[in-house]
Curated annotation (Swiss-Prot):
Originating species: Bacillus subtilis (strain 168)
PROSITE patterns hit by this protein: MFS
Superkingdom of origin organism: Bacteria
UniProt xrefs under PANTHER family: LMO2377 PROTEIN (PTHR43414:SF3), MULTIDRUG RESISTANCE PROTEIN MDTG (PTHR43414)
Gene expressing this chain: yuxJ
Membrane protein topology class: Multi-pass membrane protein
Membrane-traversing stretches: 2-23, 38-60, 73-95, 153-175, 195-217, 237-259, 272-291, 297-319, 331-353, 357-379
Location of the protein in the cell: Cell membrane
Keyword Membrane: yes
Coiled coil residues, start to end: none
Keywords associated with the record: Cell membrane, Membrane, Transmembrane, Transmembrane helix, Transport
Main location: membrane
Protein name: Uncharacterized MFS-type transporter YuxJ
GO cellular component: plasma membrane
Lineage: Bacteria, Bacillati, Bacillota, Bacilli, Bacillales
Amino acid sequence: MWLANFFVSASTTMIVPFLSLYIETLSSFSNGFVQRWSGYVFGITFLMAFLVSPFWGRFGDKRGYKKILMATGTGIALSIFFMGFVTSVYQLFFLRMAMGLVTGFIPTSLAMISAQTPKSSAGKTLGTLQMGQVSGSLFGPLLGGMLADRFGFTYTFFITSFVIFSSVLLVLFGVKEKHLAEKTAKRTSYSRKEVLSYIFHHPALWVMMLLTMLIQTGNFSIQPLLALYVNELHGPVNLAFFSGMAFSATGLGSLLLARKWGDLGDRYGHRRILIGLLLAASFFFIPQALASSLSVLLVFRFLFGMAMGGLLPCITAAIRVQAPGSIQGEVLGYNVSFRFLGNVLGPLLGGIISSHFTISATFYVTAFLFFAGACMLWIMQKLRKDSYAKAS
């Protein structure tokens, strides 16, 4: 599963650094048009994924996660393959929309491994799995940038599609899902309404889901614009490659500490680690807005990645601890929905802010989002401590 996550993450991030550059080649557009449509094309995938992911989650509970992994992987591969043939931004938008219907390979793999992991070691295990995704996101943008500069965008789409389909074969022949029949036999069937009611009556769960949305909104607000920002700092020479470096710097930082943050969360509490990581992420975004050179941007993208690497594994582990086993799969599925919602809102937010102000302004707004997330989690912690004190 680690290898499959690595290949899928590497392949999908191969096309991200030059997506806005690809739009520019489709016609003669203004900068504002490219910035807006970079956000739209980037975000529509995750809007569709947000709408359909609860159905994938329920299907996984009933039929198994492996089938979802194979279906989503094949769909992603086909969608990216046909992107190499588009002649307009609207065709690209439609294919990204179709891709959203089957996007969810990596979140589904996290849900599958989480459901089969003891709660006491959930953070460390998910952090290890996260390293596969992060490793792929580290090498993917660099490889995609080099391929795009050398062979062009079209062949890069074809290569990406082939690698993702190889991951599907890896899951088919190399992954064995444990159905845990002895546990599922004791479970009670809950309706979707009952599961939602449970979530809404347990703040520890829905606050974590809101945090997932905030984190993804902040992280994805700048990603479609990063190539344009690198162009402002460095110029057009080998732009796809240096844009890939900016993406990979974040991945390298995450790779170094993803497993460590999960381990610390298991030992000292996931919420405590999350507050520190959110504050650090907020702090490291501000210098990116003030960067005067590509090297400065790369340094702080790397530092941001060190904080970012532990956020989603700690949140998933915290939900894993809080949710009863009988509804755990579906609860994690709703968290995936909030994750995709953040993936939708982020590019839209970044595109709107950058087109009306500057790309630098997007960094400031993102820093505020991470800071707000830390404050929200701290307030929840304080309220829980006060309620425990009154009860005792």
